[in-house]
Amino acid sequence: MSEFQIDKIGLKVGLEIHQQLAVKKKLFCNCPSVESEEYPIQFFRKLRVSKSELGEFDPTAIFERSKSKTIVYNANPESSCLVEQDEEPPHEVNENAKNVVLTIAFALKSIIFNEIHVMRKLVIDGSNTSGFQRTMLVSQGGYLDVDGKRIGVQSVSLEEDAAKILGETADTREYALDRLGIPLIEIALEPVSGKPEEVRKIALALGRLLRATKKVERGLGTIRQDVNVSIQGGNVVEIKGVQKLDQLEKIIEYEARRQHGLVIISSKLNNMTLDRIAKEGDVKNVTEIFRNCKSTVIQKALKEGAVVKAIRIKNFSGMFGFEPYQGIRLGKQIGELVRFFGLGGVFHSDELPNYGIEEIEIKEIKKTLELEQNDAFLVLAGEMKKVEPAIESIIKRIEDAKVGVPAETRMATSDGETIYLRPRPGASRMYPETDIPPIIVTETELVDAQKMIPKSWEETISELENTYDLNPQLAVQVFDSNYSDLFEIICQDKNLSPNFVASVLCSTITNLERQGLDSKLLKSSEILRAFNLLSNGEIAKESIEIIFSNIMSGKTHSIDEIIKNASISKMDLIELESVLDDLIEANINIVHEQRERSIGPLMGIAMKTMRGKADGQIINQILEKKIREKLD
């Protein structure tokens, strides 16, 4: 395997940031931008591909059509209406959303158009009931300064968010409509050359600018970063769905390594004599050969009435398993492609015998395909209507391997890799929206938007430090967290220490997440109530973590129930002193032996029984006082 050097491959990365706007209503109707928990309405759609005005088909639409999926939509009248169901024309554009985008365009020194045209962007994966997403270009050009470098802005757009996917089977894909239509800002930056950590800094700086407006949503799922990655000699690959900054560097590094590995593979292929695969002569039905095979994947498919097909690739032996870098193989790329047709997978000759496919089947395949010594083969099983388009895509992908890096769209995974999603869209993907007239941007709107440009990053952090007496590190943590607005609301209560509130929101919740607990279960209303109870003296500081832990674990959503079950209602001072008197008497030997140093072990014993029932600092003070009295 080769040694990968990321700074020697001509890496270029372009960022597209998609951020939900906090404007309460959806983009083209009056439905609130809220998340539903129940969906009493359900309906089904089968989206079909159609030609553009120029009579052309978009490649992504053709690809999605080949999967032949039924789309199931779930809706709640509290968060969606007939507009989301595509049973009613869109209403006028959300003026608040438009004004926020104008402000951000000004902040980026972008040139705003005086007339905005709504367009339809073809989307046929089912995430839009209409088969398209409404989007409008608001401005072009501009820049963002990051660490002394000026990063160009390509465009700023306002668009509607897609439906939320709930699940997928081989034949269906299921969505919820509560997210569909929520206003999004899309900012596309110019591609930059540099290391992944530099790209992360750019994304962080842009995210901070957006958050400084206080008009964008926060939390997982409210911001998504699409990353366009290319290397010297390769096409641009779009990576969708990067939700966390921590993922960004790993994904860029993996994708750069994957692409360079494909370039190495193509270089090797171009030094070989290869024939183009002929579907008529090189593809055979080998179902009967596998009737009694031990492969669980193939046997499962056969029980469902599948066919098994084999493809001959002349002079290709060893190329599916060739690994220029660890984990980068052409066989793996083709496996990703096949899975998106709803097939269990594909087997290639470089990995066989294995997976229940034995020498007896391999021998029969070689005979049926008339293989020569240096030939390779692929085997796949599934319904005929899925296998046929999958074979066409495999043949094209093998041809693309000779070129190097094919232009495609991939999806980011949680472990920092990418998997195949679909082909790159073509120019015929976008066409005008006929239900909405052009939107005029008035001079008054421009003046008002310019007045709303947020303070700089440095000014914002300085203001947090001075207003709440935070150190610089904690001020940055508060601003970058999902709870900065909530922090300011909680700190209006003068009984609460801003430093303690910041520590809970930025450290306690993060630590609970690291233990595998789910912060999405912790609502802002519950956080506010917990701090109100603390301010009123009904619970101790230590109770906050106990309450959050119970909610984030999914055990209960009721704070009253947690207080009752965990026995964390606050002790009064008389009861506390009585309990500590009993504790000292029960451990009087420790007090006499260790004297003043006995505070440590006694404090540990006290906190085991009184954690959440009394403030730790008060327990410590009373213990110290009572130990001194005993020793005197």
Features from the language model and the residues they span:
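Basic, nucleic-acid-interacting segments
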Residues: 1-453, 493, 628
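M16/insulysin-pitrilysin zinc metalloprotease superfamily fold
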Residues: 401, 430, 498-501, 509-521, ...
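Long, charged low-complexity interaction segments
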Residues: 442-446, 453-486, 500
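Structural motif
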Residues: 469, 491-501, 538-539, 593-597
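Short amphipathic alpha-helical segments and their helix-coil junctions
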Residues: 478-495, 509-515, 523-531, 581-590
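Strongly charged, low-complexity linkers/loops
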Residues: 519-528, 541-609
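Short, amphipathic C-terminal "tail helix"
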Residues: 597-632
